[in-house]
């Protein structure tokens, strides 16, 4: 594949984002326990990166080794570069943990007791805990011709034990494997009286490595080292063969834990011959092995901030506000009747969205509710409201995306519960994930003595997930605008029925009109710039990868259009290249909250068209998903989106990173006045 316009590598871009996340852990202005959390978030992100992106690269190399990546590199060269950078990132992560964060935690009375630091009393407590709580659950596997190397589960914690001696059957013992069941706690609190610290903890691996001999009686343990294997977690569902998506998916889910290995993590002190054996058994090469100085899974430390009651070491809690348009109205329907309502999460509460649905479930005038679900969590008041509505006799239709990665099982469970109470459940369109965030409520109203049906809509950039609504930045729009409501109605009809392409008046919809409308809007700016008029594009999203959009932005820059991009994660566009993209800037905001809203701004001859969307500018969002972009027409709300979603990010000089033409990011440095987008919005909206 030849590359007409220069692009940056996707996998390297993802690692770059995780480097920016890890930089939060090094920032002394970030509270200490939050710095630990950022280290854990980096580990969690890397797990998914290997399960999906690196697994995909390995498959491509096996299937078509001569192919090129979209940025023009050979697959093998790209893989080698990604591995090298990933190794550096992991090394930096563990160095930061052990040399900076853990010593600082110890100074604050938060300590992890390694087995070589246990005194006699601590040792006796640890022995009792191991024998009573751990040993009954563990299953040792001795390796011999009758006990082949087990296929360990994806991301499970395992221990490889080197043994010496003969067992009760006279067999020569060489090696054993112990897998720690997921039911066992990865972190155990040591009693305060024994610890000597305000908060003392022991890792599961410390118990295992010290007492593993109890699992192999009368044998000598020469070494015991932890390891973890990451596997390909993509699910394969043959779209041409399936007759029931839910049944097909339920059959595939167990296989996720046993896919092809893509990464081996071992403790740094693991003997070389043991590492070689693990690599052979995993069918991996040396470059796929990550030797870490400490625990092989730092995600397990994510629970520590929740276990430690030290508000001074965490982000200051906040109370999200609620717009007066809602608090001053008798019901949510009255509030929306008075005008469009914009909610900016997490600064403004997600509760009004729940209240809208809960009121709809109980309102005798409501006759129908339609809802899309992508991610909503295992304990969702929103889903409870949908089930209550169905039990109350409403016509409830829910489009549940069963293929939302890593939420498949949760969504299958919700689909079953919804069907059990009489809701209509559909799974979208096979081959096109439904990623759009839409709620439609149909209500019977009486005006001037005449009854009619009135529609109410909520559209969002983020999921219907109350927990992430406090962690992610997103916009939501509540409206009774007739044209928007009609468009949303038609999209739901398309998702639940079978029909041709829609003609929508207000919404841009993928995989049909969203991509061409974006290109057309950029072209208007190009034409205006060439005519000597003011022209500008500002867009905010999670990722920018789609080549034809990037080509249009390059052309816009060359025509003199000022293009400002706020891309939190991976961006394949090269900014600031003379003659190509010198009029384009790319920023990434990384802070307390995950930047998640998608905003498209086009100057449009002064009309200032503003669209909010669930879609990033990626191939998958524009061509392989059902997405919608919706306009903000109300002038006051439009100014809010521009100010709160775009301008504050462009002015941020504390949490913003600027991309340079080589693809590397450098943190923007504050001048005399510090401007932090998220902190400014917290101060504006929250108490």
UniProtKB/Swiss-Prot annotation:
Q: What does the UniProt function comment say about this protein?
A: Catalyzes the reversible transfer of the terminal phosphate of ATP to form a long-chain polyphosphate (polyP).
Alphabetized GO MF terms: ATP binding; metal ion binding; polyphosphate kinase activity
By sequence similarity, the record places it as follows: Belongs to the polyphosphate kinase 1 (PPK1) family.
Q: Which NCBIfam families has this protein been placed in?
A: poly_P_kin (TIGR03705), PRK05443.1-1 (NF003917), PRK05443.1-2 (NF003918), PRK05443.2-2 (NF003921)
Name this polypeptide is given: Polyphosphate kinase
E.C. numbers: 2.7.4.1
Q: Which residues bind Mg(2+)?
A: 375, 405
Query: Per UniProt, which keywords does this protein have?
Result: ATP-binding, Kinase, Magnesium, Metal-binding, Nucleotide-binding, Phosphoprotein, Transferase
Q: Where is the active site?
A: 435 (phosphohistidine intermediate)
Gene source species: Burkholderia lata (strain ATCC 17760 / DSM 23089 / LMG 22485 / NCIMB 9086 / R18194 / 383)
| UniProt catalytic activity | [phosphate](n) + ATP = [phosphate](n+1) + ADP
Q: Per the UniProt entry, what is one GO biological process?
A: polyphosphate biosynthetic process
Q: Which Pfam families match?
A: PP_kinase (PF02503), PP_kinase_C (PF13090), PP_kinase_C_1 (PF17941), PP_kinase_N (PF13089)
Describe PTMs of this protein.
An intermediate of this reaction is the autophosphorylated ppk in which a phosphate is covalently linked to a histidine residue through a N-P bond.
Give the required cofactors. Answer: Mg(2+)
**One GO cellular component from the entry?**
polyphosphate kinase complex
> Which parts of the sequence bind ATP?
45, 472, 568, 596
Which gene is transcribed and translated to give this protein? ppk
